Amino acid sequence: MWKYVRKYLYFAIPAALFMVGEVSMDLLQPGLMRRIVDEGVLRLDAAGAGGLDLIFTLGLTMVGLVLFGGMCGSLNNMFAHLASQNIGNEIRKDCFRRIMCFSFPQMDRFGTGSLVTRVTNDITQIQNFVAQFIRGMIRTTMLVAGSIFCMFRLNRQFGLMLLCAFPLLAGCMAVCLYKAGPLLPRLQEQLDEINSVMQEDVAGIRVIKACVRETYETIRFGKANDALVGTQLWVLVIFAFMNPVMNALMYIVVVLLLLSGSVQVGAGTTTPGAVMAAITYTTQMLNGILNLVMLFQTLTKGAASWKRVREILDTQPELADSDFEGKTAAGAGVEFRDVSFGFPGAGQTVLRHIDLTIRPGETVAVMGATGCGKTALVSLIPRFYDVTEGAVLVDGVDVRAWRQRALRDRVAVAAQKSELFSRTIGENIAWGAPGAPEDALRTAAVTAQADGFISAAPEGYGTMVAEGGASLSGGQKQRISIARAVLKPAGILIFDDSTSALDLKTEADLYAALKAAKPETTKIIVAQRIATVRRADKIVVLERGRIAACGSHEELLRTCETYREIYDSQMGEEEPHE
C-alpha cells in the first residue's frame, strides 16, 4: 500500500501535524484547569475578589486553546480524507484496469459478485483505514502517552496508579480484538456471498418468476443474509461487552484517585486542582484506549480488505501479450493446427485435434449438437482462451504472437448472449467503432435488419436502452448486437448463434445484406439451422469435440450421416435431398 500512500504524503503529513496540534491543545487543558482551581477559585474571598483576574485570563486562554485545537482538528479531518479518498481512487482505478486484463477463466475464478465487492466495499474499507490511521493512531498514541507523562509530572503517585491501570485496560482491549479479529474477514466473505446471490437473482428474475422459484430464492438469500447478520451480531456483542468493562475500570481508577487525592490534600502534599487534573487525564487516557479499540476494528477490516484487493492487483494476466500488430486487410485467413482445448479447471477436453483452414473472404458455418464445442472453437480465434495443444493462426501468425488489442481489432463477434449497455441504441451499435459517422452506423443497422424498429422508436438512434436491454425483445437485441459487429472494421466476423431469435425471413434477409455489404470479410457462422448454413462456402460439422465432416451443403448431404440427420429433422419433409 505504501506506493499509493507516498503519492499523497503532501496530504498525509499536514494531517498528522494538525492532529499533533489538536492533541497538544487537549493535553494543556487539565493543567490550566488545575491553576484555575488552585490559584483562582481557592483564593477568592467572600466578596469574590482575589483570583478573579486569573480565572478570567486562564478561562480565555482555555477558550483560545479549544478554538485552535478545533481548527487543527478540522484541518486534520480535511487533509486525512483528501489523502484517503485519493488513495482509494488510485487503488480502484488500478483494480479496474487489472480486471480488464483478466482472462475469462480468471474472471470465473473470482466471480462477478466478489469482484464488485472488492472494488466497491473493500476499497471503501481501505479508505476508512487510511483516514482513521492518520487521525486515530496519532491521536490515540499522543493521548495515552501524553496523559501518563503529564500525570507523572503532576503527581508521581497518581502517575503510578494510571500506569498500573493501563495494562488492565489494554488487556481487556486485546481480548476483545482477539475474539473479534477472525470474524471481520468472514464478514467480507459473507458480503461477497450476498452480492453474488443478489446479482444472480436480479439478472435472472424472469427465469425465477417463470419457474415459480421466488420462495426458494428468498430462502437462499435469507440464509446468506442470516449468516452475515449472525457474524455482525457476534462482533457487536464482543464490543458491547468491552465498553462497560472498560468504563468500570475507569471509574475504579477515578475512585482510587479521589481517595488518594483526598488523603494527599488533607496531608497538604497535593491540591484539589491537581486531583481534578488527574481525573481529566485519566478520562483522556481511557478515551484514547476506547478510540484505539475502534481504530483497531477499522484497521482489522482494512487489513482484510487490502488482502482481498491485493489478490486482484497481484494476479497477473494469464494471456501473455506480444507485439505483432498485423496488417489492415478486408479479410483474414484462419487456421487451426491440431488444436485441442479444455476449459481451465473443467477437467475435460472440449475440442480434440482440430485441423481446419479458412481462407480470407470465405464464409464458413459450424454446426453440431449442443455441447460439441462450437462456441469454444470460435472463442479461440480472438484468443479469449489459449489452446491446450496445437495452434490457432490468423493471417499465418499464431494468435499468441499477436498483440491482443491488434488481434481483437481484426475480429468482430456477435455473441450468443446479446450484451447491451445502458446507453443509447446508437452508442451501443458504435461500441466497437467509436467515432463512426452516423451514415455508417445507419448502414450497419440496415444490414442487420435493425433500422426499421430503431427508426420507429420515439427518439430513433438516441433511444436509451434499459439495463441489460430489458426494454427490447430478444430479436431486437440480437440485431443491435449484429449491427455492432458489422460496423466494426474487422477482417473476421464471427456470428456465434447470434440469429437464433430471428425468424427465417429476417435471418435470410440479414445474411443476404451481409454478403453484399462485406463480400471480402471472412465470416464464421455458428448455427443450428440448416437454412442458416446451407449457402456457406464450407460447413464444418462438429461431433464430440472433433470434426466429423467438412464440405459444402451438397457434399455433406451425400457423405455425412450426422448432417443428413439434422437436415431430415429440419427440412427433409420440405424438399428432397440434393
Role assignments for model-derived ranges:
Residues 6, 10-75, 79, 152-158, ...:
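Transmembrane helix-loop-helix hairpins at lipid-water interfaces of multipass membrane proteins
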Residues 7, 11-24, 132-187, 256-270:
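Transmembrane helices of ABC transporter permease
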Residues 17-18, 25-38, 56, 65-112, ...:
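Juxtamembrane helix-loop junctions of ABC transporter transmembrane domains
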Residues 20-28, 67-74, 126-129, 133-145, ...:
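Hydrophobic alpha-helical transmembrane bundles that constitute the permease/transmembrane domains
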Residues 43, 150-164, 234-307, 312-313:
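Helix-loop-helix
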Residues 44, 85, 93-117, 121-123, ...:
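Short intracellular "coupling" helices and adjacent cytoplasmic loop segments at the cytosolic face
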Residues 48-51, 327-578:
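ABC-type nucleotide-binding domain
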